[in-house]
Amino acid sequence: MDMDNQNTKIYTDKFLAVTSLLFVFISVAGLAIYSQESIKIAATWMQWTTSVFTTPVLLFAFLAIIFTFGLAFSKYGKIKLGEGKPQYSTMSWIFMFILSGIGSSTLYWGFLDWAYYYQTPGLSLPPESAEALKYSVAYSFFHSGLSAWAIYALASISLCYSYHVRKNKGLSLASVIEAVTGFKSTGVVGRLVDLMFLLCMFGALTISLVLTAVTFTNILSQLTGIPNTFMTKVIIILAVSVLFALSSYVGMDKGMQRLSHMVCLGVVLFAIYVLCFGPTQFILNNSLMSFVLMATNFVDMSLFTDPMGDGKFTREWTVFYWLWWISYAPGVALFVTRVSKGRTIKEVIFAMVIGGSVGLWFIFGVFENYSVYSFIHGAVNVPQILSQQGGEVAIGQLLSLLPAGKLMMWIFLGIMVVFLAAHMDAVGYAVSATCTRGLSEGQDPSPNARLFWCVMLTLVPIAMIFSKAPLDTMKTATIVTALPFIVIILIQTYGLVKWLIQDYAKVPSHLIEQQGYDDQEIGLNQTQDEHAKRMQLELASSIKLDRKTS
């Protein structure tokens, strides 16, 4: 770390922290007091947002795949993000950023997503038909696959490059915007950007936490007969929060890294159990068919606007999902940046887009196809239960059908708790880093700051449950905030392209691959003009050396 980094003052942006908390709790109070009005307003917002921005959102997600893979396969994909060896093993690294990008509600959707597509299918298929059932898991693969993770990768790479290569200070969204545009991170624009990010993180995590708490308490009630009450949900949330707070307080290496291993290995082993002791042949066959259907119809699924129809499926599912992933992207980018020092751009892109997609395809393929099989053979009418009683009831019934069903339900609940704690840890880190100014490479927010945000992130969902504020309204608000993030990610991407051209356009591919440029020695901490001059001198020297040895 250079002397400039060491002398940089690190402090908490109290104005940003207080303002964001005021906005969050006022919003919760408003949702509780004006619940009916907020539901109507939210429905109008959602309808307008998904209708007007259908084509831009679809194109954004589709082009994100093209750009990220193009970057990975180009010479720029060989650029190393920071000096030295990677801080974490490849497995730990992948586990951690996967958990930063998906919440514990993934376990909920893993059993039920297909049922929604069966009832309201895409590609103009008849509802609840054989064709709709055939494409149901394929659409689930599509919405959790390449496009989604490419959005995460697109947001992450520019921040990684700014922080680890350009050595720009501050691990926040506003910091990279400052590096690209010149707008100060502590100015009006910078604080507005970070405020939107914080509100979005609170909203997204609250939705995931409340949904998990509802699912957990319902299954717990089926197992033990404990009443599914407000206090039961609060106890569950507090238990998760204690685990989350301990993990966050002890730091990334002792906390998040261990939790991520526990969760990912636990989920994989649970899925293997379902695969082996469930309808193995059906799960394998339908997973393969669903993957092929997704692959062969990928462009149609990506750009299906349904201009001759009402476009309802595209608006309510594909556009909704892409906006949901976009709303999470800045937070994921902050966390990925923190754990990716020493990796190359290509490694980050492939690990996120391929690793994240394959991981979710495996989990969704096993859980959803077990659910589909149970529906086809009349064991559990998942679509009907989903519509009439709620998804958490359907999950409980599905788990109870497994061999050693009650034991599997307990294990599922345990995985869900640790999953949620790990995800909250990642979000808590991103939030505390955003409110901590002056962070340089290798520095983290203080343990006390992380602990404070643990408490705040816990209070909001409890307040939502207690006040009976409509969760769908907060979901809509979170989705709507994704629109500005599209612009912000595009600005970040513009900055990334500009930096890559300035820094490496004239550098041969083999020199990048050999890591012939020591980032500190060539002056990446200097001005851009000085940096460009040093790069030219280094390039000229390497050419002379090649001539002498040839």
Where does each model-flagged region fall?
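N-terminal alpha-helical transmembrane segments of multi-pass membrane transport
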Residues: 1-132, 272, 276, 493-500, ...
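Membrane-water interface regions at transmembrane-helix termini and the short interhelical loops
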Residues: 2-10, 34-49, 68-87, 136-143, ...
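Flexible loop linkers connecting adjacent transmembrane helices
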Residues: 2-8, 40-46, 73-91, 115-138, ...
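Helix-loop-helix module between adjacent transmembrane segments
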Residues: 7-32, 65-67, 102-106, 143-214, ...
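Loop-to-transmembrane helix boundary motifs in multi-pass membrane proteins
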Residues: 9-27, 182-191, 228-245, 249, ...
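Membrane-interface loop-to-helix entry segments
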Residues: 50-53, 60, 193-201, 207, ...
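Extracellular/periplasmic helix-exit of transmembrane alpha-helices
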Residues: 109-123, 161-163, 167, 274-297, ...
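Membrane-helix boundary/coupling elements in multi-pass transport proteins
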Residues: 165-169, 197-217, 330-352, 406-435
